[in-house]
Swiss-Prot record:
Gene Ontology terms describing biological process: DNA replication; DNA synthesis involved in DNA repair; double-strand break repair; SOS response
Gene name as annotated: recF
Species of origin: Nostoc sp. (strain PCC 7120 / SAG 25.82 / UTEX 2576)
Name by which UniProt lists this protein: DNA replication and repair protein RecF
Binding, ATP: G30, N31, N32, A33, Q34, G35, K36, S37
UniProt xrefs under SUPFAM superfamilies: P-loop containing nucleoside triphosphate hydrolases
Domain of life: Bacteria
Length: 376
């Protein structure tokens, strides 16, 4: 797939900016806080309807403007598609494909696929379990767009069940309350779908990431990725997962009512990353943690390509400066011209002449993009 054009209106610090991509690799050069990352974020939103910055929709819209708009033209093996995403301060979104508004956002997902790699991704190793859950969910949305709807359903039931548990805190109702049993059943049904899909996705991703990690580390370190769901998972069969889920809910009913929150379910899952059988967050240097994240990102690229049968876009947000020369070379050698790549950087000295000669170079200053070097 190839992103041909991108048009941003009132998005972040872009007032009205069109970009045409003319090479497999585009390098966006500029000082910090000029808008380089914002452009990559716009592409990420088209791919996943999510931002790794965890921003609210009102953060995307320029002050005193009612909406922000992202338009793009994408070329795939199946033909050319025009994508449109309108963001509003109140969080209501409109998506359109080839000029036709789509009733379900799920139908917009999967048209454009992209893997984002930024310095924030080191949090995958050293951050909280929520960071790893969000990463896995974002990958799953691209592998299986219906997952976005499943996850939304689960989160909605979870919010409603938590609200009901808070009511029970100050009432005389017991754990045998019939309304709670209804919420339990809904949580189990939707949560089981989340658990099974996360388990399947990691089962496919883990061997790819392990192989990349072995290659990058020179076979000196062994990476293991384990999905440890909050609900005990013996076999990935829906009936067994549902039974285990319901049993754990019933066991934790008293502490749940006491605390007014749901203590069982995939919102408490963990993805364990270990190097040489030691938790990665405790293991070694930042360089070793970067190797792990690089292996995860290369595995994402490979898995998405296997599933969708086309190479996804790669969005590299100021990460080359964070990698040592050997890891840089591993990444750049993998990319070549196989993946359309958008790269942000503050200077061009990280790139060798061959890369620069085969790349489109754009300069970014205060939300304006040009082919001149005025921002140097």
């Amino acid at each position: 797939m190839y992103l041909k054009t991108l048009h941003l209106r009132h998005f972040r610090n872009y007032y009205d900016q069109k970009v045409e991509f003319t090479a497999a690799k585009t390098i966006l050069v500029g000082n910090n806080a000029q808008g380089k990352s914002n452009l990559l974020e716009a592409v990420e939103l088209l791919a996943t309807l999510r931002s790794h910055r965890m921003a609210r929709d009102r953060d995307f819209v320029q002050e005193e403007e009612p909406v922000a708009q992202i338009n793009a033209t994408l070329e795939r093996d199946t033909g050319v598609s025009d994508l449109s995403l309108i963001l509003r301060r109140n969080g209501r979104r409109t998506v359109a494909l080839n000029g036709e508004p789509l009733r379900r956002q799920m139908d917009f997902l999967g048209v454009l696929n992209a893997v984002q790699f930024s310095s924030l991704d080191l949090e995958l190793v050293r951050g909280s379990p929520e960071v790893r859950r969000n990463w896995l969910d974002t990958l799953l949305i691209q592998l299986e767009p219906v997952y976005a709807h499943i996850l939304q359903q689960y989160n909605q039931v979870l919010r409603q069940r938590n609200a009901y548990l808070k009511k029970l805190q100050d009432s005389a109702l017991t754990t045998q309350d019939s309304a709670l049993a209804i919420w339990d059943a809904q949580l189990v049904t939707t949560g089981t779908k989340v658990i099974r899909r996360r388990d399947r996705a990691l089962a496919r991703l883990a061997p790819l990431a392990t192989a990349w990690h072995t290659s990058i580390s020179g076979s000196t370190e062994v990476l293991q990725i384990n999905y440890t769901p909050n609900v005990q998972l013996v076999k990935n069969q829906p009936e067994e997962v549902q039974q285990a889920f319901l049993s754990q809910l019933q066991q934790r009913a008293v502490p749940e009512i006491y605390r007014g929150t749901t203590l069982v379910g995939p919102h408490r899952d963990e993805v364990e990353l270990t190097i040489n059988q030691t938790p990665a967050r405790q293991y070694g240097s930042q360089g070793q943690q970067r190797t792990l994240v690089l292996a995860l990102k290369l595995a994402e690229l490979q898995l998405i390509e296997e599933v969708v049968k086309e190479p996804p876009l790669l969005l590299l947000d100021d990460v080359l400066a964070e990698l040592d020369p050997s890891r840089q070379n591993q990444l750049l050698d993998t990319i070549q011209d196989r993946f359309q790549t958008l790269i942000t950087t503050t200077h061009l000295s990280s790139f060798d002449a061959q890369w620069l000669n085969s790349s489109q170079i754009l300069f970014v200053e205060q939300g304006k993009i040009s082919t001149s070097n005025a921002v140097r």
